Regions:
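N-terminal catalytic or cofactor-binding beta/alpha core of small enzyme domains
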Residues: 1-190
C-alpha cells in the first residue's frame, strides 16, 4: 500500500483530529511503551491489543483511525511515523513494542525490529502459548533505524505483525498479550 501522506505534518493539514483520527496515550512512568501506530480502523484491533498488553503496567500510545470509511489514507509507514506525542513517549522508553496487523489467515505473528533479545524472548513466549511465529518474513523485518519501534532510548525495539484470524480471536489476543507481558518481565528483570 502506498501512503497518502509522507509524514504526520502532511497528514494533519488534511485530516482533523477527533473527527478523522484520535490519539490515545497512557504514560504510567514505565520504561516500556506499547504502541499501535495504525490503530482504530486503520489496522483493526491493533489498538485493543496494545492496550491489552499495556494494562496499567506499561505506557501505551495508539494512533486510531475513526473515519466512517477510507481509514487507510491515515496509514503512515512506520519509518515515516513522526507524530510528536508518540516520539516524546517513545524517546523516554528503554523497551518499545509496536503492534501491527497483516492480512491473511495464517495464524501467525511475524516479528521484526532491531531488539534481537526482546524479539527472541517474545517469540519463545508466543511459541509456548501455541502461537505460530515467523522472524524472517521479508515484508516485516522492521530494521529501518527510523522505524517508530526503533526510536526508544536504546534505538531498538520490536514489531509484531498479527494475522487477521488471530486478531479476530479473543482467546488468541489474550495469549499474545500474556506472551508479550511475560517476555517483557523477563527482559526487564535481567
Amino acid at each position: 500500500m502506498t501512503d497518502t501522506y509522507k509524514n504526520y505534518g502532511e497528514l494533519k493539514v488534511h485530516e482533523e483530529i477527533e473527527k478523522d483520527y484520535k490519539i490515545s496515550i497512557s504514560n504510567v512512568g514505565s520504561q516500556t511503551t506499547i504502541i499501535a501506530p495504525h490503530g482504530g480502523k486503520i489496522e483493526p484491533r491493533t489498538s485493543d491489543i496494545a492496550k491489552h498488553i499495556a494494562t496499567e503496567k506499561y505506557n501505551y500510545y495508539c494512533f486510531e483511525g475513526i473515519k466512517e470509511e477510507d481509514n487507510g489514507c491515515l496509514h503512515l509507514t512506520s519509518h515515516n511515523f513522526d507524530e510528536p506525542n508518540a516520539a516524546k513517549l517513545i524517546s523516554g522508553s528503554d523497551f518499545v513494542v509496536a503492534i501491527h496487523a497483516c492480512t491473511g489467515n495464517s495464524g501467525t505473528v511475524y516479528l521484526g525490529g532491531t531488539d534481537q533479545i526482546l524479539k527472541n524472548s517474545i517469540a519463545d513466549e508466543l511459541e509456548t502459548k501455541g502461537i505460530n511465529i515467523s522472524k524472517d518474513h521479508p515484508r516485516f523485518k522492521g530494521l529501518n533505524p527510523n522505524n517508530i519501534c526503533n526510536q526508544g532510548k536504546r534505538k531498538k525495539g520490536v514489531q509484531l505483525e498479527i494475522s487477521r484470524d488471530l486478531r479476530d480471536d479473543r482467546e488468541k489476543i489474550g495469549l499474545i498479550s500474556e506472551a508479550v507481558q511475560a517476555a517483557l518481565e523477563k527482559i526487564e528483570s535481567a
